């Protein structure tokens, strides 16, 4: 009886290990594709792929996060004219991720989705989408005050805010510098996000 139980336990362990290996390989492959994706079609395909991985795994938030991130990159493209509809897709993926785990990375994407909506008409949307973007940053920083992507996004907001409203290059520069310092010292877990460092460095150069 004891040998039978040990054999069953061993089979379960081997099966779990194989499933974990397949998940890791699939994620690594598609994260690499996301890093090099340039078209809306590529990004849409990747968003769907990550969503399917998440649905298959059921307990992993990262696939849904990357689905939302792919949809977010679509939102920055000029061809994406309906920012509200795109943001709804982003937030649907984020809801799946946050049902498993709320963390700073999902709030970074939430910030970008709200920012894209706000930029449709900054003057009229600042009080709604602008506040949502700011709130997402604050929630993320409360969970992880050393997240470099959150400071990069905060610096971007300052950079694009007129000086008479508390923004400008002078205000953005030290926040970009903090972001870059945190990127340099970061030790992300396997499969965790690493994007943003080059963008932060490029923007800092514009603040000189």
Task: Give the location of each predicted region.
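Hydrophobic, well-structured mid-protein blocks that either form specific transmembrane helices
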Residues: 84-133
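Bacterial Sec-dependent N-terminal signal peptides
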Residues: 1-26
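Structural marker of alpha-solenoid helical repeat scaffolds
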Residues: 56, 99-100, 143, 182
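Helix-turn-helix repeat elements of alpha-solenoid scaffolds
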Residues: 35-49, 81-93, 126-134, 173-178
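A contiguous pocket-lining binding segment that forms or flanks enzyme active sites
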Residues: 125, 129-157
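Canonical positions in the second alpha-helix
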Residues: 53, 96-97, 139-140, 179
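Amphipathic alpha-helical repeat scaffolds of TPR domains
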Residues: 20-32, 56-78, 101-121, 147-161, ...
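Terminal, low-structured helical/coil segments at or just beyond the last alpha-helical repeat
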Residues: 170-174, 178-208
